[in-house]
């Protein structure tokens, strides 16, 4: 089960974001603090309910880059899966579990916490695999399996990789149910960052200066207002870019090995790192884009398979996560861009992604900005 791509998480309480300099931001935070915070059980229930709708699963399976990568990543590991047991964490409609059965798995435990488990069971039965794929309703943290498993498969990645914190469920399953030396599909993840010039945003910011030539009314005075509205917020914007929007060589700032002990604690404390790059040429810099890739082991004779959400690769439903500066900054060839980025769970809702960004562009003073995924 992946994140509800077109749905919003409920935060149920005060949140982070921004630099705290605008009066309206302060008023909004005060109002948020007055709202009662939801309990973990309530947050989880709302999260699971998002997956009871067919649209979420349609979007995920229709993403050919995603679904083909999982199918190939599983089938290429047929030698490790043949005659073995597999746990599918967050099985959704069951397609990954069926891929595992097609690869020769003896038994697949498809664990799904949302009501869509009923449709998963129907799909399994419709494909004649009910003797090998067992759909188990409930969160993986509470479901009991009859045995340890040889492999775990899961599509746990959210926007910006870590939105919705599903990786923690996979790690719980790894610790409790995976045999020593067992297979994880995918096995690792990497995070990247790069400065960007958003062409669509640039057009929108300049729109108000173009009104006069069309209608004879000068509205260029609204450019500053448009900039505050479109860039001055603290939301992580999920949007697809092209390679042309990237202003410098992407920098990897984090790598997660899912087999690594202690990864759960790292996620709670925050995943991140430093970065430094030089701009290719002259352009308005609007912010940063972050994206990820995950890697599947190659099997006995194949190279590892990489599923990338880079703007230089075919588009996926994950797109990229954009972090806008408060206003554009003009950069030139070889302008130095550096900083530090940390991804961590929000305080009010651990499933909601928060990003802390410290950055410096050229000779400008260092700045910081606190972002959060939209509720």
From Swiss-Prot:
Biased composition, class Basic and acidic residues, residue ranges: 28-38
Name a single GO biological process.
Answer: methylation
One family from Pfam that matches here is PRMT_C
Which family does the similarity line name? Belongs to the class I-like SAM-binding methyltransferase superfamily. Protein arginine N-methyltransferase family. PRMT6 subfamily.
Residue numbers spanned by region Disordered: 1-38
Locate the SAM-dependent MTase PRMT-type domain: which residues? 44-374
Tissues showing expression: Highly expressed in kidney and testis.
Q: What is this enzyme's catalytic activity, as reactions?
A: L-arginyl-[protein] + 2 S-adenosyl-L-methionine = N(omega),N(omega)-dimethyl-L-arginyl-[protein] + 2 S-adenosyl-L-homocysteine + 2 H(+)
From what organism does this protein derive? Homo sapiens (Human)
**Residues modified as Phosphothreonine:** 21
**Gene Ontology cellular component list:** nucleolus; nucleoplasm; nucleus
Q: What is this protein called?
A: Protein arginine N-methyltransferase 6
């Amino acid at each position: 089960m992946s994140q509800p791509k077109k749905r919003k998480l409920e935060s149920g309480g005060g949140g982070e974001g921004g630099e705290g300099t605008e009066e309206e931001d302060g008023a909004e935070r005060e109002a948020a603090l007055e709202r009662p915070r939801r309990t973990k059980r309530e947050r989880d229930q709302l999260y699971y309910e998002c997956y009871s709708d067919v649209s979420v699963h349609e979007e995920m399976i229709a993403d050919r880059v995603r679904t083909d990568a999982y199918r190939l990543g599983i089938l290429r590991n047929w030698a490790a899966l043949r005659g073995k047991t597999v746990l599918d964490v967050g099985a959704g409609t069951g397609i990954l579990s069926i891929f595992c059965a097609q690869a020769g798995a003896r038994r697949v435990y498809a664990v799904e916490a949302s009501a869509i488990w009923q449709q998963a069971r129907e799909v399994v039965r419709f494909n004649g695999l009910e003797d090998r794929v067992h759909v188990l309703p409930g969160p993986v943290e509470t479901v009991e399996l009859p045995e340890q498993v040889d492999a775990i498969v899961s599509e746990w990645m959210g926007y910006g990789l870590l939105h919705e914190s599903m990786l923690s469920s996979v790690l719980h399953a790894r610790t409790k149910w995976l045999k020593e030396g067992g297979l994880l599909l995918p096995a690792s993840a990497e995070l990247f960052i790069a400065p960007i010039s958003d062409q669509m945003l640039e057009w929108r910011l300049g729109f108000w200066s173009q009104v006069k030539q069309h209608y004879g009314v000068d509205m260029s005075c609204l450019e500053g207002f448009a900039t505050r509205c479109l860039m001055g917020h603290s939301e992580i914007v999920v949007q697809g870019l092209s390679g042309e929007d990237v202003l410098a060589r992407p920098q990897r700032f984090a790598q997660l090995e899912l087999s690594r002990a202690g990864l759960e604690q790292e996620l709670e404390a925050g995943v991140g790192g430093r970065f430094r790059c030089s701009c290719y040429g002259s352009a308005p810099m609007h912010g940063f884009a972050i994206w990820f890739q995950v890697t599947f082991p190659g099997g006995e004779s194949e190279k590892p398979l990489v599923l990338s959400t880079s703007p230089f690769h075919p588009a996926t439903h994950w797109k990229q996560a954009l972090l806008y500066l408060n206003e554009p900054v003009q950069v030139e060839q070889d302008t130095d861009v550096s900083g530090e980025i940390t991804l961590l769970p929000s305080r009010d809702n651990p499933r909601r992604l928060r990003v802390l960004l410290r950055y410096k562009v050229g000779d400008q003073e260092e700045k910081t900005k606190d972002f959060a995924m939209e509720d």
